[in-house]
């Protein structure tokens, strides 16, 4: 009996580590998906730096309680798979929602972001976000725009100053 308890404790620790080491986690109901469809989903998630693992509800509940995640118990019913985004939560969520459009048997249950349980519509909002690198580019562009404007204003003032000096030089040359 003891080896089984140790084995379950090991699985709980694996689930905890998956959640802790990820940017976000999403619980899905995969009931009705074929092995080929699950393999396709795994491949698509892997391309986006995410992975998916089928978990036992009781062990997932235990892992959630150990991590201090509350409000997850009602969603841990029926077949459950845990998808974790190691890099970009938006990309992983987008893959899941796109896959669910083509495969209605896949149902997104709930998400976990920084140990906070997110409803399906909140996870959908994350999926609708642009990828991380696009957001960073927009942020950087927004930060650089005022600097370019300031540099342009300084260059314009310097240009006017040079033109004024040139006009004074021509005026003095004309007086002599």
UniProtKB/Swiss-Prot annotation:
Pfam families membership: Ribosomal_L10 (PF00466)
Domain of life: Bacteria
Presence of keyword Electron transport: no
Entry-linked InterPro entries: Ribosomal_uL10, Ribosomal_uL10-like_sf, Ribosomal_uL10_bac, Ribosomal_uL10_bac_type, Ribosomal_uL10_CS_bac
Keyword RNA-binding: yes
Transmembrane segments: none
Biological processes, Gene Ontology terms: translation
PANTHER family: 39S RIBOSOMAL PROTEIN L10, MITOCHONDRIAL (PTHR11560)
Subunit-level organization: Part of the ribosomal stalk of the 50S ribosomal subunit. The N-terminus interacts with L11 and the large rRNA to form the base of the stalk. The C-terminus forms an elongated spine to which L12 dimers bind in a sequential fashion forming a multimeric L10(L12)X complex.
Protein name: Large ribosomal subunit protein uL10
Organism: Carboxydothermus hydrogenoformans (strain ATCC BAA-161 / DSM 6008 / Z-2901)
């Amino acid at each position: 009996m003891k080896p089984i308890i140790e084995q379950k404790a090991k699985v709980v620790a694996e689930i905890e580590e998956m959640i802790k080491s990820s940017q976000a986690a999403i619980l899905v109901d995969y009931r009705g998906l074929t092995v080929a469809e699950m393999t396709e989903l795994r491949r698509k998630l892997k391309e986006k730096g995410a992975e998916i693992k089928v978990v036992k509800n009781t062990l997932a509940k235990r892992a959630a309680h150990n991590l201090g995640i509350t409000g997850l118990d009602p969603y841990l019913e029926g077949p459950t798979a845990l998808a974790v985004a190691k890099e970009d939560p938006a990309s992983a969520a987008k893959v899941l929602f796109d896959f669910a459009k083509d495969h209605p048997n896949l149902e997104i249950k709930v998400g976990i972001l920084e140990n906070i349980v997110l409803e399906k519509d909140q996870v959908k909002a994350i999926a609708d976000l642009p990828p991380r690198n696009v957001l960073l580019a927009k942020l950087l562009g927004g930060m650089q725009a005022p600097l370019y404007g300031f540099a342009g204003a300084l260059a314009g003032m310097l240009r006017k100053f040079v033109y004024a000096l040139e006009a004074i030089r021509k005026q003095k040359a004309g007086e002599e």
